[in-house]
Amino acid sequence: GEPRHCLATNGTAAWQAEMTELLASSPFGKQAKVWPGKDLWALRSLLFTEPVDLLIGNSYGKYLERDTGTPLIRLMFPIFDRHHHHRFPLMGYQGGLRLLTTILDTIFDRLDRETMQTAVTDYSYDLTR
């Protein structure tokens, strides 16, 4: 998936221009919309009107996950509702591995939840990941 919404409560017009340029420079970011000065309530509305597959954010995103059913990947500061997540790297090689692992684990968790019906949706991926 490509990014769809990039939102920052303290985002300025300069930030919006910079992010728009950055996203437009990649074929994967051309569809993204940049939203400066918007809060979680605005993001909640966006998730209902223009749904996405995954949400990357902090602990406050858990309420959006509950309301919209969009799986949350906790990567940003602050993370209050998970133990020792502040110690995990976000930058460099180790951070990249952690990001990849976290995203894949979230996708696998969702796949497991959505494929529980015996002989209907129970694909045999359980032990081959």
Language model features by range: what are they?
Residues 1-129:
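An N-terminal assembly and electron-transfer interface module characteristic of large anaerobic redox
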